[in-house]
Amino acid sequence: MNEAISFDLEDQGNKGRFVARLPGNSDEAEMTFSRANEKLIIVDHTGVPDSMAGQGVGKALAAHVVGFARENGTKIIPLCPFLKAQADRHPEWSDVIQG
């Protein structure tokens, strides 16, 4: 996993996205979500541009979102196939992953 990845949250209330960036790269990876309620988000999409492929950005973004959920007492419904596949590989995420 790339330790230089930085993360941001763009939260517009009922929807938003988690953004990952690499130094020296103007592209952004994202994981978009909608908020079902105060303690439940639905992640519906993960996008990693070609310029970031193979650098562990998608996996790091998934782990970041899980960490965010734990810190905030939030659960995640992974409609996004990528996040669902990552959750299946990480049973230790079951405390925040629903479905």
Question: What spans do the regions from the language model cover?
Answer:
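Conserved acetyl-CoA-binding loop-helix of GNAT-fold acetyltransferases
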Residues: 54-67
